[in-house]
């Protein structure tokens, strides 16, 4: 199985109508969407997702923000998808993100940076398991697979 990563369009990205733009960037890169849903996260889900930041001063604000509205949760699959997604997304701080990245082009500030992406294989596995049931992920092969990826 190819590598998988978790990506979430945060409430600011959903409210600003950026879902199609962001999905398109991942599709044009050649990654395969295997899981997709819109959900307003519960406080418990948000606290577990951001648990590594629990002792940080911004934790409460982060949890409050991510639970403030709908999030588009996605699982993308492809060779090197974790590292590639991080490059597509850009730096956490939008002012440090390169033009052409999602945050460089679309994000306003660190508190409203539009998108989240897993940063490592272990994180991706944890986040996918947290946000998706196995039955919500679809194994499928695009008809143009041979034109995108070398065997």
Curated annotation (Swiss-Prot):
Q: Which family does it belong to?
A: Belongs to the NDK family.
Name of the top EC class for this enzyme = transferase
BP-aspect Gene Ontology terms:
CTP biosynthetic process; GTP biosynthetic process; UTP biosynthetic process
What cofactors does the UniProt entry give for this protein? Mg(2+)
Which protein are we looking at? Nucleoside diphosphate kinase
Q: Which PROSITE patterns match?
A: NDPK, NDPK_LIKE
Q: What does this protein do?
A: Major role in the synthesis of nucleoside triphosphates other than ATP. The ATP gamma phosphate is transferred to the NDP beta phosphate via a ping-pong mechanism, using a phosphorylated active-site intermediate. (Microbial infection) Catalyzes the phosphorylation of dZDP to dZTP, when the bacterium is infected by a phage that produces the substrate for the synthesis of dZTP (2- amino-2'-deoxyadenosine 5'-triphosphate), which is then used by the phage as a DNA polymerase substrate.
Q: Where in the cell is it found?
A: Cytoplasm
Gene3D superfamilies in the cross-refs: Nucleoside diphosphate kinase-like domain
Write out the catalytic residues in the record: 116
Q: Does Cell inner membrane count among this protein's keywords? A: no
Question: Which Pfam families does the protein's record reference?
Answer: NDK
| SUPFAM superfamilies named in the record | Nucleoside diphosphate kinase, NDK (SSF54919)
Question: What molecular functions are annotated in GO for this chain?
Answer: ATP binding; metal ion binding; nucleoside diphosphate kinase activity
